[in-house]
Amino acid sequence: DYREIGRWLGEQLRTKKQKIGVIADWKMSEAVQAEICGLNEALEGSESKISWCIYRRKEQDIVERMKKETKADALVVLDAGILEEFGEQAENGTYEGAELYGVGYSLKTIALLDNGNIQGLAVPDGYEIGYKSVEEITKRIEHRSYKMQGYITEYQVLGKENFSMDEDLERFLYSYE
C-alpha cells in the first residue's frame, strides 16, 4: 500500500519543523502519487512542509537539479536507485545534505540504513509484487474477459534507531519467505 508507505515516511518527519524535499520516479505513476498523498496526509497539522518535489526524468542529473531548489532539512526519496546512490555518496563522504528517508528494495539500502547513511527506510516486498503481477497477467491471458485486480502487499519499515543488521537481518529476511 503505497499510501501507507508515504504516511509512514511522513510520520518520521513530522516531529520537528523541517523543510522537506521529495525526489520521486515518474510523475504519472499511481504508486508515486499515492506515496506523496500519504506523505502529505501525515505532515498535515505539523510544522514540517514539503518545499519542493522533483520527478526524475531520463538522463537527468538529480544533484544538479536539486541545486536549483531551496535547501531541505530532509529528503524523501521515492526512487530506490537514487536513494541507494545518495546513501553510497554519504558512505563515501561525498554527500553533504539533508537526512535521507525513502523506499528501497536492496540489501545495499538496508546496509546503508544500518551504517546510519539513511535514517528511515520502507521496504516493499518486491517478490510478492512481482509474483502477484505475473499471476494476474496469466489469468488475463488465459481468460480474455478476466478483469485484472490490484493487491495490497506487505512492507517493512526500518528506522536507524531500531534496526541492527547483526540482530535483525535474519528476522527481516525470514519475514519475506
Identify the function of each model-found stretch.
Residues 116-123:
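Rossmann-fold dehydrogenase core element
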Residues 128-177:
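Hinge/cleft segment of the Venus flytrap/periplasmic-binding protein
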Residues 5-9, 30-50, 85:
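Short, solvent-exposed amphipathic alpha-helices that sit
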Residues 1-21, 105-109, 124-143:
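Hydrophobic alpha-helical segments within soluble ligand-binding/sensing domains
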Residues 39, 55-112:
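Hydrophobic alpha-helical
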Residues 17-18, 70-72, 118:
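Short, high-confidence coil segments that cap the C-terminus of an alpha-helix
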Residues 21-30:
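Short beta-strand->loop
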Residues 15, 45-47, 95, 115-116:
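Short, well-ordered coil/turn elements that cap or connect secondary structure elements
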